[in-house]
C-alpha cells in the first residue's frame, strides 16, 4: 500500500473520500508516500500476520482488500525460489485466511502478465495463462488459483489484475524509485553521468530491441478502483482476471528516444 502502485491507489481512494488502512512492512516502500493514511507496519508472510490482520479487519470494519504485497524481481525469484514462495504464497495465504476469519469477502489482487510466460500469440488473452517461466510468475498464477479455491469454499468475491509494464507517475512524490525498471534505470544512469545501455539488439522486432506493453500507473490505479467498485456494488464481473495494459508494444529504443525528446538532450546510448 505504500509502494509505487499502491500509493497511487491509496491517494485516488482518499481523494474520493474512501476510508483506507494500509498494511506494509516498508521493506521496499516509504511511509511518506501515503501521508497521514493509517499505517500498520507488518510483514504479511510472518506467522503472526493472520491474527493481526483479522483483528485489524474487524476493528476497522474493513469491507474489501486490495492485495499488492509481493516480491517481484524475476531474476531474484530464480535465484531464491523457496523464499519467493514463502513470501508471495505464504503472505497470500495469511491474507485470505484473515479475510475468512474476519468475514471480509472482497479482494482485488495484484497479478501479473508473467502468468503467460513466453506466449506464441502477438496479443495475449486472459484464457492463455498457465505457462509462467519463473517462480515470480508462478506465485502470481498460484495466487489466482487460491482465490478461486476460496470462492468455492467460502464465496470470496475477487478480481485479479494482470499488470503489464507500469511506468510514469501521477504525482512527482509518487514516482517509481526502483532502478530495476527501464525508465528509472535510464534516468539513474544519466544522473550519474553514464551512458544509457541497451541489452539486446537482435530481437525479432522492427528495431531489434525488446518490445513491451507499457501502461501509465494512474491508468493502472484507476483499474483497481473500477474493479473494487464492481465488487462493492455486488455486480458479477464478466471475468475474474483482466489484462491491464494498452495492447500496444513499445521497444526499448523507442522508450529511450522518447526520453531524449522529453528531456531535450540527446544523451549517449550504448
Regions inferred by a protein language model and the residue ranges of each:
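Short capping/connector residues at structural and topological boundaries
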Residues: 31, 79, 121, 129, ...
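Short, amphipathic alpha-helical "lid/cap" segments that border enzyme active or binding sites
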Residues: 50, 54, 183, 217-225
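C-terminal substrate-binding subdomain of Rossmann-fold SDR/epimerase-dehydratase oxidoreductases
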Residues: 190-270
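N-terminal Rossmann-like NAD(P)+-binding domain of SDR-like oxidoreductases, especially those catalyzing
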Residues: 1-166
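Short, flexible, glycine-rich and Lys/Arg-enriched loop motifs at helix boundaries
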Residues: 31, 160, 165-182, 192-212
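Short-chain dehydrogenase/reductase
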Residues: 85, 133-141, 176-184, 213-214, ...
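Basic phosphate/pyrophosphate-binding loop/patch that engages nucleotide-derived ligands
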Residues: 100, 149-152, 182-191
Amino acid at each position: 500500500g505504500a509502494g509505487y502502485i499502491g500509493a497511487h491507489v491509496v491517494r485516488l481512494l482518499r481523494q474520493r473520500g474512501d476510508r483506507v488502512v494500509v498494511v506494509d512492512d516498508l521493506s521496499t516502500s516509504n511511509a511518506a508516500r501515503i501521508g497521514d493514511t493509517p499505517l500498520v507496519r507488518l510483514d504479511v508472510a510472518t506467522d503472526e500476520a493472520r491474527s493481526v490482520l483479522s483483528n485489524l479487519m474487524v476493528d476497522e470494519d474493513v469491507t474489501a482488500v486490495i492485495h499488492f504485497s509481493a516480491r517481484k524481481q524475476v531474476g531474484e525469484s530464480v535465484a531464491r525460489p523457496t523464499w519467493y514462495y514463502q513470501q508471495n504464497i505464504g503472505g497470500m495465504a495469511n491474507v485470505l485466511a484473515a479475510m475468512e476469519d474476519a468475514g471480509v469477502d472482497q479482494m482485488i489482487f495484484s497479478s501479473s502478465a508473467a502468468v503467460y510466460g513466453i506466449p506464441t500469440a502477438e496479443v495475449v488473452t486472459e484464457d492463455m495463462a498457465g505457462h509462467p517461466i519463473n517462480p515470480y510468475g508462478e506465485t502470481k498464477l498460484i495466487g489466482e488459483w487460491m482465490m478461486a479455491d476460496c470462492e468455492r469454499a467460502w464465496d470470496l468475491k475477487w478480481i485479479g489484475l494482470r499488470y503489464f509494464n507500469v511506468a510514469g507517475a501521477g504525482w512527482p512524490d509518487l514516482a517509481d524509485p526502483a532502478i530495476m525498471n527501464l525508465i528509472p534505470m535510464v534516468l539513474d544512469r544519466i544522473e550519474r553521468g553514464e551512458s544509457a545501455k541497451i541489452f539486446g539488439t537482435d530481437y525479432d522486432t522492427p528495431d531489434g530491441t525488446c518490445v513491451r506493453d507499457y501502461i501509465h500507473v494512474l491508468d493502472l490505479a484507476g483499474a483497481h478502483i473500477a474493479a473494487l467498485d464492481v465488487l462493492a456494488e455486488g455486480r458479477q464481473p464478466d471475468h475474474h482476471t483482466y489484462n491491464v495494459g494498452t495492447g500496444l508494444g513499445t521497444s526499448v529504443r523507442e522508450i529511450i528516444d522518447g526520453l531524449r525528446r522529453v528531456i531535450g538532450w540527446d544523451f549517449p546510448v550504448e
